[in-house]
Amino acid sequence: FRKDMIMEVLKEKNVKLEELTGIVARGGLLPPLQAGAYRVNDDMVWQLKNKPAMEHASNLGAIIADAIAKPLGIPAFIYDGVTVDEMMPILKITGLKELSRKGIGHNLNTRAAAMKYAREHGKEYKDCKLIVVHLGGGISITLQYGGKVADIINDEDGPFAPERAGGLPSQDLIKYFGQSGMTAKEMLKKMKSRGGLVAHLGVNDSREVEKMIENGDEHAKLIYDAM
């Protein structure tokens, strides 16, 4: 379905497939990676189809790119995938030895924004020390220096967002899960796509919330300010 939509857009824009020399897609939830470009191959496609780190639309990027590129005999790539993990080891440590923090986040967007800032200010990206925030269905906050995403507060740890529940009180979360009757998969779906603004206001579009506030909705203002 998504591939067909892409092909239709290319047709509308008069892009000739035989003139393409390569295709670049968003990287999905692969095992931890260093930042940069990776060529899509059969192993990557299999991993994303069968053993992704978690379910997410970004897993489709490399799969679709490969499906378009192969018949044309051109390479497909991903760049700065979701699982770029260049965090300093000390920052991965938590209060439970069985659990560690992971460098999963909106790396493509935040690294691109950091590089754009560096260019606009006549600096080398590797010489900058920046805090970059991604605002979308989830919110992630990155610390970037030395040319790496050195630390990240991802959409599981930080503020709630239009769709994500964000960081939650751990003891209360455990109690709630035990009493909810939900499976682990159902609970994760609730936290990932039915939390935040969706949970409180029933919408995932901040522009709609802003209209509610303009119309005098005090509860909407409270929730928006909390986010």
Feature roles, as predicted:
Residues F1, C128-A150:
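Gly/Thr-rich phosphate-binding beta-strand-loop-beta motif of the actin/hexokinase/Hsp70
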Residues R2-K13, A113:
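Short, well-ordered amphipathic alpha-helical segments that serve as non-catalytic structural scaffolds
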Residues R2-M5, P52-G61, Y224:
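Glycine-rich anion/phosphate-binding loops
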Residues E8-T21, E120-E124:
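Phosphate/pyrophosphate-binding loops at sites that engage ATP/ADP/AMP, CoA/4′-phosphopantetheine
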Residues K13-A57, P75, T83-G95:
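Short beta-strand-loop/turn "lid" adjacent to the catalytic site in phosphate-handling enzymes
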Residues N59-A67, I78, I93, E98-D127, ...:
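Glycine-rich phosphate-binding loop plus the immediately following alpha-helix
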Residues G81-E86, G136-I139:
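Short acidic/polar capping segments at secondary-structure boundaries
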Residues K189-M227:
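Adenine-nucleotide phosphate-binding core of ATP-dependent small-molecule kinases
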